[in-house]
Amino acid sequence: AETASTDRWLFVDADVRLQPDALRALADYQDANHVDLLSAFPHQQTDTWLEKWLVPMMHVVLLGYLPLRRMRSSTLEAYAAGCGQLFMTKREGYKAAGTHEAIKSSRHDGLKLPRAYRKAGLRTDVVDGTNLASCRMYESTAGVIRGVLKNAHEGIANARLILPFSVLLLGGSVLPVVTLVVSVLTENFWAGLASIVGVVLGHLPRMLSAIQFRQSIFGVVFHSLATLLFVMLQWVAFVMHAMGRSVAWRGRTET
């Protein structure tokens, strides 16, 4: 970045493919909304069944629980959010936030870089980049698992968030399926009816995000199992961090 001669900079992962009009669209949005750091979620290409299950969970977890209006009207660090695959910033904002040097110990720049900007009193935003870029993050089942684990501690797999998020995710997306099965086995009509409502409401965010971000219906159908697996991986990451163990990612481990 130090050698760049322009005032607007783009940080993009090597596996992200941009559409011809992507940069102009992002720059126009950034200028129109006076955003210091703009992030976009590229279209996530998923081929394997585990990719279809787990990759779209980032839309459900991040955007499903993020109050977007409040995030856009505030610079509080608590509302920091982004996608590390694609960032657009301006030189002065990047310098004021401390550059990537401020987050050099982190592998979750999608969260940490927006937080650094907000700590400096700057505005950040995250938008849907489905029509602007595409990316396939993982190419194997093992890669998906490692990818989820590597960012987990800086996301929700920490002492402050793991319990409430486990209750929210399991209670909203897994428990209604369990109670539906039990109500069918016990022939309890009203419990079954209430459970069906719970299942629909629990799957609705996944369905809406699948439509918005053009994700597979396969992930929607198996959303309860995907959520259960996702939460289990968060707890694995939580225990691993407590034991001082790190996850290797593309030849690197945490320091």
Please name every model-derived segment.
Residues R17, M88, R107:
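Short aromatic/basic micro-patch
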Residues L163-F165, L169-G244:
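Membrane-embedded multi-pass helical conduit in multi-pass membrane proteins
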Residues A242, W249-R250:
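Structural motif
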Residues A1-S5, A25-A96, E101, A152, ...:
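Long helical/loop segments within the catalytic core of UDP-sugar-dependent glycosyltransferases
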Residues V12-D13, A40:
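Thr-Gly-centered strand-to-loop micro-motif
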Residues A14-Y29:
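Acidic donor-binding/catalytic loop of UDP-sugar-dependent glycosyltransferases
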Residues Q30-N33, L37-G64, E92-K95, H100-I162, ...:
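Catalytic donor/gating beta->alpha subdomain of glycosyltransferases that bind UDP-sugars
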Residues W9:
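Short aromatic/hydrophobic "clamp" motif used to bind/position activated sugar donors
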